[in-house]
Structures are given as C-alpha cells and as structure tokens.
Regions:
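N-terminal catalytic cores of NTP/NDP-binding nucleotidyl/phosphoryl-transfer enzymes
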Residues: 8-71
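Residue-level signal for inorganic ion chemistry
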Residues: 26, 79, 118, 178, ...
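N-terminal Rossmann-like or analogous alpha/beta NTP/dinucleotide-binding catalytic cores
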Residues: 58-144
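Glycine-rich, Lys/Arg-enriched anion-binding loops that position phosphate/diphosphate groups
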Residues: 141-242
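Phosphate/ribose-recognition catalytic cores of enzymes acting on nucleotide-derived substrates
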Residues: 195-312
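Extreme N-terminal starter segment of soluble prokaryotic enzymes
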Residues: 1-3, 14-15
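Cofactor-binding loop segments of dinucleotide-utilizing enzymes, especially the Rossmann-like FAD-
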Residues: 52, 92, 153
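Short acidic-hydrophobic, aromatic-tinged amphipathic segments that line or gate anion-handling sites
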Residues: 2-8, 88
C-alpha cells in the first residue's frame, strides 16, 4: 500500500475510492474496502482509501477531546493489511471544513485525486456541516463523471457495526464484543511513566501508562486480561491491567496499571501496546492493602487459566 499525504500529490492515476475517518478500521470498514478493491480490479483501476490526519470535530472544537479507537499510525498499519493500493491522508483544517460537498468532490476528488467511482459508507456524510444527502452526492457525481455507490452496512446479530457502537461496548467493559466488531482485540498505546509504586509493594509491579498524547478511548474501569508488547518488539507477553482510580488508596486520578507476567525489566519512557482480552471484574475498594493483594493473586490465577484455555 502506498501512503500519500495530500500535499505530496501531483495527480493520482484513475481510481475507485472511498472517504472517511476510518477510526479503528473495524469489520464494517473492512467490508466496504473489500467491495472497493474488488470493483477497482474489475474496472482495471487503482483502489484508494481517503482519510484525514485529525478528527474533524477536533479541528472545529478546540476543546473537544476525541476518544479514538486508533491513532493515525495504527490506522495506516491496519489499512496496509487490506489489499487497497493507496491510502491518501488529507490535512483537515478549517478551510477544508468550509467546503461544500460539491466543492470537495470537484476540487479534491475529481481534479486532484482522479476519482472515477466513489464508495460511500451507509451512514457517511461529508461537506460543510454535513448538510447534503447521498442523493446530492449522486447528482454532483453525475455532473463530474464520478459514479457514487452506497455500500450496505455490515451487521453482527442485527447490529450495524460502526465506530460509535464499538466505543459503546468499550465504555461498558465489553472488550470481547468490541474485538468481535473490530476483527481483532482493542489495543491502546501509551508511554510507560512513573507511578505510585504501590503494586510493587504488594508483589505486583506495574507498568503505568500515559496515553494522553494518543487520545484513545479508555475502556470501563476494572481488571482486564491483556497481552502487551513494547513498540519496537514483536513478542506479546501476558499480563493483567487495572483501569481505575485506585480506591483502596483513596486515589482520584484515573490510572492504567499493567502487571506483566514473568517480567521485571526497566521499560520507563518506552511505548507499550496493550491488547485487551477480557474484563475479569469491575473496580473494587478493599479494606486494606493486604486484602487487595489477596484479590490480585486470585485475579492472576483467573487470567492465567483464561490464557491456558485460549491456548488449547
């Protein structure tokens, strides 16, 4: 897959394209991209996914804090695992936000990206204030020589899969359902930072994550079975993560603490990927650190048994 930043484009060869933010590159997105690639091959054209370098709402509302399923880098990596030829990254700014759908289709899709067919997700809208409808896109496309095609929704158990649906599952701690919709486990990336060192005192040293730079959604508070790896390695290690405010220690700040099994290395300031497997329990307040330590031992056994069953 060729990754092309919009400012670097002279002009693309004629292509079949789709446009969207593609947060998470979930199974609904994969379903659309599969149809896109199939059509492009039949037509003898290149296939192109057009996305943005920033969440549109973040550009329009400076104080908006997005809850992303993927970073731009992880999104591009996921797109590269499809069979699409090109990923075009548009720089979304206020000037682009002010463009009508007709202007965007003419100036960006037609004149610059050489789009001949445009696949639109079943619920996708674009253009200033998202004011226009699919029928408008079809009419504009007809004028410009772009065939506009609406892709059907991808469903699981009668539910239309979308990034919003996946976020809802994660906020409930339903990481297994989120993984079913994504097609892979939900994964956070963060920098390992100094914590409160309470886990080490309890016999469970943890890697504490700061994910503020990446803007990803944090699943519901609780204890999770996870797999982790450092960004520059390929080996996934088993572990368990606590998401919460440390109520036993009267904490108020949300923390992400990961105990990596059979590991006690120094990984401060490194980037760690955490892949969520299953929520073991909700967050609890214990009467003493000793009671918490006993529960952590139970949690560890629960997680180890879970991984053994998955390995069978």
């Amino acid at each position: 897959m060729n990754t092309i930043h919009y400012n670097d484009i002279v002009q693309l060869p004629p292509c079949v394209a789709t446009i969207g933010f593609f947060d998470g590159v979930h199974r609904g997105h994969q379903f659309l991209i599969h149809h896109l690639v199939e059509t492009a091959r039949k037509e003898g054209l290149q296939s192109t996914v057009i996305t943005f370098d920033a969440h549109p709402r973040k550009v329009l509302q400076a104080d908006y804090q997005p809850e992303m399923l993927s970073t731009l880098d992880s999104k591009l990596l996921l797109l590269s695992k499809t069979e699409v030829d090109n990923a075009v990254v548009l720089h979304f700014d206020k000037a682009m936000a002010a463009m009508s759908a007709r202007e965007f289709m003419q100036q960006v899709l037609h004149d610059h990206l050489n789009v001949r067919k445009l696949f639109i997700g079943y619920d996708h809208r674009f253009g200033h204030n998202r004011e226009e409808t699919f029928e408008d896109y079809v009419r504009y496309g007809r004028e410009m020589g772009i065939e506009v095609i609406r892709n059907e929704a991808f469903q699981i158990d009668g539910i239309n899969i979308s990034s919003s649906v996946i976020r809802s599952f994660l906020k409930e701690g339903e990481v297994e359902m989120a993984a079913q919709c994504l097609g892979f486990p939900y994964t956070l990336i963060g920098k390992v930072v100094n914590g409160f060192h309470e886990g080490r005192k309890l016999g469970f040293p943890t890697a504490n994550l700061d994910i503020s730079h990446f803007g990803q959604l944090i699943p519901a508070p609780g204890v999770y079975a996870v797999r982790v790896r450092l960004e520059n390695t390929v080996v996934w290690k088993r572990g368990m993560m606590n998401v919460g405010n440390r109520p036993t220690f009267n904490g108020r700040q949300l923390t992400l603490e990961t105990h990596i099994f059979n590991f006690d290395g120094d990984i401060y300031d490194q980037l760690l990927l955490v892949s969520f497997v299953k929520r073991i329990r909700g967050e609890q307040k214990f009467d003493s650190p000793e009671e918490l330590a006993a529960q952590l031992k139970e949690d560890e056994q629960t997680v180890l048994v879970l991984f053994e069953k998955k390995a069978e």
